[in-house]
Amino acid sequence: MFIESFKVESPNVKYTENEIHSVYDYETTEVVHENRNGTYQWVVKPKTVKYDFKTDTRVPKLGVMLVGWGGNNGSTLTAGVIANKEGISWATKDKVQQANYFGSLTQASSIRVGSYNGEEIYAPFKSLLPMVNPDDVVFGGWDISDMNLADAMARARVLDIDLQKQLRPYMEHMVPLPGIYDPDFIAANQGSRANSVIKGTKKEQVDQIIKDMREFKEKNKVDKLVVLWTANTERYSDVVVGLNDTMENLLASVEKNESEISPSTLYAIACVLEGIPFINGSPQNTFVPGLIELAISKNCLIGGDDFKSGQTKMKSVLVDFLVGAGIKPTSIVSYNHLGNNDGMNLSAPQTFRSKEISKSNVVDDMVASNGILFEPGEHPDHVVVIKYVPYVGDSKRAMDEYTSEIFMGGKNTIVMHNTCEDSLLAAPIILDLVLLAELSTRIQFKAEGEGKFHSFHPVATILSYLTKAPLVPAGTPVVNALSKQRAMLENILRACVGLAPENNMILEYK
């Protein structure tokens, strides 16, 4: 059975006019290596920690500024939100299609809340806590091309023509602000698009971004703003002592106009200085050590890296299944070809390397979890190939071969072909990232014994379900397995309303 909404009744949960308070017993384990009777033993000790959660239920008017607004992702997302808000339908060769938010975790997935008369009861994911309605989001952003969003939508060749015709009047007046352009960080083939750029030194560029954000907030009367990078993949920046290794050195390098400070890092600096959440949707190392330190010092949310939308999402499920089933993956070969601007930019070796790194590390935690299958340091052979084929456009082809060792020396091979409509998969992920980033800024908590409530760590691991290479605080384990990432996110939000984590034991029926 599916219900649209619910309210929790519990002595541990209190609803006030503007807040939800919950008291939550977090049950976990502590592993110690102890000397007992002259022999060291591993001992697992269950423990319970009491947490207080406090969630502000006042939903703000949200503005979202996209870096690369005129690209395939930005134009597709903007078009999709307008189509949903206006209730647009359009004819395809198969049927009359209604606008929807399929592919969005927050808008189109469900959670189990319990059972009723022996039947499982499910509710929308978004019913857990008050979230911004995507129809109410105000979009804006920057681009190195001055093309309006209607023309950008046509150039992208993602949406059906009938839909594009209906959306054009809503989008032709939407023109991105000039963006930061540095040809050293992206492929040379992007130069032909760069007709709307912010001139000046890096300090002047940061100041301009800050000015743009302030004016956007004022003009649109938004309460909160989230900025997300969906522009070109950049090459990796060199991390150098004295340049970008500390907060002070990074800010000084901006003042000195150091060439190795990337455009994405400049946008992120501007956001952090303004206390505006910044999310990196591409694989480059935007978050150099100095920037992470700056975000922590300002308690400003940062998240990334790289949207997890197609091939990598499948990989984070399949490898988790194989290793969890006691099957040993020994070779993973991933091939992609695509024809959109992302593919053209990735045809340059230095930008491809950024993508290769984010795609290749996705299985590390799953391999490390099973010392029966893998010796220390052992790892499957893992190769990632991306080629640019203009004809296929946004319809990316992903082909994977997984070779594994099975019982008694046997071999198992799984071959998968996945046609990933790149921007149609990425757009709802962008939506989830900005909505969850905003929501997380309204949640505070404290452990038993702590005096004051505090927000989540500025490095937002809560967003990891949506990213290929999750950014985590120093000393925090990186989790890539998709099921674990979703469980983490759902269970944290459940804790905010006093619900136990979903453990699937269903003991009442055993």
Swiss-Prot record:
One of its GO terms (biological process) is inositol biosynthetic process. NAD(+) binds at residues 70-73, 143, 180, 190, 193, 230-233, 281-282, 306, 309, 340-342, 355, 393-394, 422-423. Its cofactor is NAD(+). It catalyses: D-glucose 6-phosphate = 1D-myo-inositol 3-phosphate. SUPFAM superfamilies: Glyceraldehyde-3-phosphate dehydrogenase-like, C-terminal domain (SSF55347), NAD(P)-binding Rossmann-fold domains (SSF51735). Pfam families: Inos-1-P_synth (PF01658), NAD_binding_5 (PF07994). Its main location: cytoplasm. It is an enzyme of class 5 (isomerase). One of its GO terms (molecular function) is inositol-3-phosphate synthase activity. Its EC number is 5.5.1.4. It is found in: Cytoplasm, Cytosol; Nucleus. Keywords: Cytoplasm, Inositol biosynthesis, Isomerase, Lipid biosynthesis, Lipid metabolism, NAD, Nucleus, Phospholipid biosynthesis, Phospholipid metabolism. InterPro entries: Myo-inos-1-P_Synthase (IPR002587), Myo-inos-1-P_Synthase_GAPDH (IPR013021), NAD(P)-bd_dom_sf (IPR036291). Pathway: Polyol metabolism; myo-inositol biosynthesis; myo-inositol from D-glucose 6-phosphate: step 1/2. Signal peptide: none annotated. PANTHER family: MYO-INOSITOL-1 PHOSPHATE SYNTHASE (PTHR11510). Key enzyme in myo-inositol biosynthesis pathway that catalyzes the conversion of glucose 6-phosphate to 1-myo-inositol 1-phosphate in a NAD-dependent manner. This is Inositol-3-phosphate synthase. It comes from Triticum aestivum. The lineage of its organism: Eukaryota, Viridiplantae, Streptophyta, Embryophyta, Tracheophyta.
